[in-house]
């Protein structure tokens, strides 16, 4: 199956070369709420309306799908292959995987019309809705209900950190500025518990939940707030061992990643894709890789993402273009730093053999 791999910084470069302008629909729109000027929300359901003009509806011969890069993006190309093969048969349209390296790149890919279906992580879902015309329609889950997750703050099992108060003066990994569980929720909840990020402890952006978990495991960070579903999947795959960690705090549940459609797909095609998702049952390997989930449940953005928007409101982090541009720059800078670190690590053995690590 063909994969597309955009270069690091793709979102920032593309935004610089392609201004975001209001569409004809935007100019005639009576209400758009929090949506960008390119979209309209006259029915006030908080997501972009289907364009009124038939000429603006899309019916692509190939459907392009991407999943949020909360872990190594290459993992998902394999995990979602059965779904894409099924969608190819179910919709009658070839469906391919588009590998993205950042949340910003994924949002911009849908905004620019090159992405038709996407799984967005919890926080960036709101950016995708407001800025890219994404319409969430499904959440993965099990036989009883859709999946939720908690923010868990993890430390090494052998650490002397026992409570959030012990994080004062420490080095704590947050994932990225737009992440609900990896940044916004801790900033909303921790001050009420006597701990203020950036003031009481140093925030270091790791670039992803898996990187935060691995960094705590390696001793690079003293603690990290991460999404419980990612943490548990990493344990299930054997990437880390549960007994090497302790959870010192957890939140109430949040919805997990959304699956969304581009707002301007031909309505008959959009409905067909929705029904294909709802009818699908995950094969065994996919169930195992995705935490035991076996199906997709209908999602309603206005209802199910209300707790996420409340967290963003609490920390004055609006899901608008200014915030998105700032996060895009941060993601690019963080990726550049990680690339430099990798280059330094690759060059280090040539200068001097590394000392054996004492366990």
Q: Where do the model's predicted regions map?
A:
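Bacterial N-terminal signal peptides
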Residues: 9-17
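An extracytoplasmic/periplasmic, membrane-proximal ligand-sensing/linker region
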Residues: 25-67, 71-72, 76, 261, ...
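Extracytoplasmic small-molecule ligand-binding "clamshell" domains
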Residues: 42-126
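Bilobed "Venus flytrap"/periplasmic-binding protein-like clamshell domains
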Residues: 65-88, 123, 143-213, 221, ...
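Short helix-initiation/N-cap motifs at beta->coil->alpha
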Residues: 97-108, 197-214, 253
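Short helices/loops that flank or line small-molecule/ion binding pockets
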Residues: 104-118, 131, 165, 209-229
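A ligand-binding cleft/hinge motif common to bilobed small-molecule-binding domains
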Residues: 122-132, 186-192, 215-218, 222-243
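Short beta-strand->loop
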Residues: 135-146, 201-202, 236-253
